[in-house]
């Protein structure tokens, strides 16, 4: 059956979020190294560890897991949008979570300095916001696909944060006929419901769409669950799990068109 629509994940599929976060950590941890004799990489590891532990201790954790908001997004998110009451709790928790993650990270390296912890907690969001990084082939491929297929962006995350990421690269959103953010919908990938919602917006059956994403546990598992073909973009040579098998594996977005052509042959 002919492909009528292409569904894209956002983070680490079209936007290189992992690199943006890494560079923000490097800049912030290097600032800390100006104050104390520490290894910035060790501080980054400590803050990531403390942030994850804190994040998973909150009563909001099951909700953030369902929506698909990770601990490091929490280090720069404001959580000012979203109708669910959990977003108001996250909005309230965010300042102390961000401060405590950095303060505890410093403490793990033997540094008791709440003032510096607060400074770093305020610096990290600014550093992350200054780094909207797009993969080099993103616009080339979207330009190639636009007009041939309906395009839908299907992204997990907090509404305000995902919109902010898109605002940082303003030429990206206009390529899409529809944009679905899990925090607005109320459930994230791999839930069947969010894929059904996408198909309804596009007016397609599962066989008429193809999902492109970098995460086996969300993009690929979810599209597999509804019988939609998919392409797992594996830029870093990751190993496949035994439980989740993509229909196709690609290393660049430039591979998309030739695979669609083969599906329609």
Residue spans of the language-model regions?
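N-terminal helical cap/lid subdomain that shapes the substrate entry/recognition surface
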Residues: 3-10, 14-134
């Amino acid at each position: 059956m002919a492909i009528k629509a292409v569904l894209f994940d956002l983070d680490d599929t079209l936007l290189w979020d992992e690199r943006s976060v890494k560079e923000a950590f490097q800049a912030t941890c290097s600032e800390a190294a100006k104050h104390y004799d520490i290894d910035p990489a060790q501080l980054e590891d400590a803050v990531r560890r403390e942030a994850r532990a804190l994040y998973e201790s909150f009563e909001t954790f099951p909700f953030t897991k369902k929506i698909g908001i990770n601990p490091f997004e929490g280090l720069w998110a404001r959580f000012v949008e979203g109708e669910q009451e959990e977003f108001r709790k996250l909005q309230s928790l965010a300042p102390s979570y961000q401060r405590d993650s950095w303060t505890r990270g410093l403490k793990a390296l033997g540094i008791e300095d709440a003032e510096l912890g607060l400074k770093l907690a305020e610096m990290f969001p600014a550093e992350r916001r200054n780094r909207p990084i797009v993969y080099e082939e993103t616009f080339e491929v979207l330009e190639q696909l636009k007009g041939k297929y309906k395009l839908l962006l299907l992204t997990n995350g907090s509404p305000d944060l995902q919109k902010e990421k898109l605002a940082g690269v303003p030429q990206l959103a206009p390529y899409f006929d529809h944009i679905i953010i899990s925090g607005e919908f109320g459930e994230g990938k791999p839930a069947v419901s969010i894929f059904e919602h996408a198909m309804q917006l596009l007016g397609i059956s599962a066989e008429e769409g193809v999902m492109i994403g970098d995460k086996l546990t969300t993009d690929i598992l979810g599209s597999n669950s509804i019988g939609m073909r998919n392409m797992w973009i594996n830029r870093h040579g990751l190993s496949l799990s035994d439980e989740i098998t993509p229909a196709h594996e690609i290393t660049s977005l430039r591979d998309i068109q030739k695979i669609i052509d083969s599906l329609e042959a």
